[in-house]
């Protein structure tokens, strides 16, 4: 009897822990924590470069760092939550999205919507603690992602990837404008790098998940026009990245070498796809390369300023 009682007491203690763990898992899925984290890398890089080029000291402006990263994280998380609410009808048809709480019903859709709106509101207020420009840029990202991408182009046009790339290119600009609202070539180049990076990244993903997108009725380029055209477009987008690092020449020769090697390597891998017979394998390689590319490039920008 004593052993049974001990087991029951242990079970009671573990239940709250399991519930909390499940809650955070579901919350992470709703806000798409992976997207939030990756975008915070580019947000931080944009902010760091703004400190560097304006001569402002990082450690003397930690309040700006906090409000920028906190605000950007909430704005991005809120946008993703609203996206989950809107896409719950098509997410059930895709393997990678069918377990989201909005599909399984473990989180009520209306609560997910209000969560998203609340996060965007708090995030915007946080960005306002830095500059009005940063808050406006953040809201531009929200409007583009929620309305122009999710509600309009995603289900209707193959250009959905391009439209969605606008919102994905906003985070480094948020980071920069939180420090300096004046026009500068650097945030423009960061925006273009992110804008051009996304089509090859997401088109490679679309090739990997082509049949899932087809089942969901989403007109991704490989679904509508096939793999060959998709591969050619991916190569064009990657090629457009080649000159951009040279506009950041003030970061030094080592950075230019790293960036150029990354760009040329990605382009060569893309061209290899024209001869490679296994399109899915090639798409997987391109997708993984794109993830490493983004991380290495933006980390290299930061390192270049302190090396």
UniProtKB/Swiss-Prot annotation:
Q: Assign the protein's first listed, main location to one coarse class.
A: membrane
Q: Family, per the entry?
A: Belongs to the UbiA prenyltransferase family. Protoheme IX farnesyltransferase subfamily.
Localization, per the record, is: Cell membrane
Residue spans crossing the bilayer = 33-53, 62-82, 111-131, 132-152, 159-179, 185-205, 229-249, 251-271, 287-307
Relay the record's extra comment.
Carbon 2 of the heme B porphyrin ring is defined according to the Fischer nomenclature.
**PANTHER family (alphabetical):** PROTOHEME IX FARNESYLTRANSFERASE, MITOCHONDRIAL
The encoding gene is: ctaB
Q: What class of enzyme is it?
A: transferase
State the Gene Ontology BP annotations: heme O biosynthetic process
Q: What does this protein do?
A: Converts heme B (protoheme IX) to heme O by substitution of the vinyl group on carbon 2 of heme B porphyrin ring with a hydroxyethyl farnesyl side group.
HAMAP family (alphabetical): CyoE_CtaB
Protein name stated in the entry: Protoheme IX farnesyltransferase
One Pfam family assigned to this protein is UbiA
> How the protein sits in the membrane?
Multi-pass membrane protein
Is Transmembrane helix set as a keyword in this record?
yes
A GO MF annotation of the entry reads: protoheme IX farnesyltransferase activity
Whether Transport counts among this entry's keywords is no
What EC designation does it have? 2.5.1.141
């Amino acid at each position: 009897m004593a052993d049974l009682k001990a087991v029951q007491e242990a079970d009671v203690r573990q239940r709250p822990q399991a519930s909390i763990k499940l809650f955070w898992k579901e919350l992470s899925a709703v806000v798409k924590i992976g997207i939030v984290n990756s975008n915070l890398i580019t947000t931080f890089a944009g902010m760091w470069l703004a400190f560097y080029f304006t001569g402002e000291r990082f450690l003397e402006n930690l309040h700006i760092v906090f409000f920028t990263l906190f605000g950007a994280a909430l704005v991005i998380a809120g946008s993703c939550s609203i996206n989950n609410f809107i896409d719950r009808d098509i997410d059930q048809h895709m393997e990678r999205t069918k377990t989201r709480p909005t599909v399984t019903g473990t989180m009520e859709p209306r609560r997910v919507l209000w969560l998203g709106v609340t996060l965007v509101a708090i995030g915007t207020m946080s960005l306002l603690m830095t500059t009005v420009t940063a808050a406006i840029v953040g809201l531009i990202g929200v409007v583009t992602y929620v309305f122009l991408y999710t509600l309009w182009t995603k289900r209707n046009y193959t250009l959905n990837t391009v439209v969605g790339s606008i919102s994905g290119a906003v985070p480094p600009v948020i980071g920069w404008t939180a420090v300096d609202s004046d026009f500068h070539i650097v945030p423009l180049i960061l925006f273009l790098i992110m804008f051009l990076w996304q089509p090859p990244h997401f088109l490679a993903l679309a090739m990997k998940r082509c049949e899932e997108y087809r089942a969901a009725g989403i007109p991704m380029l490989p679904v509508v026009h096939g793999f060959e055209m998709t591969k050619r477009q991916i190569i064009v987008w990657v090629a457009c990245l080649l000159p951009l690092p040279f506009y950041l020449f003030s970061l030094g020769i080592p950075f230019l070498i790293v960036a150029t090697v990354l760009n040329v390597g990605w382009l060569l891998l893309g061209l290899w796809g024209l001869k490679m017979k296994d399109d899915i394998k090639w798409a997987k390689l391109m997708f993984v390369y794109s993830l490493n590319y983004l991380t290495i490039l933006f980390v290299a920008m930061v390192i270049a300023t302190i090396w």
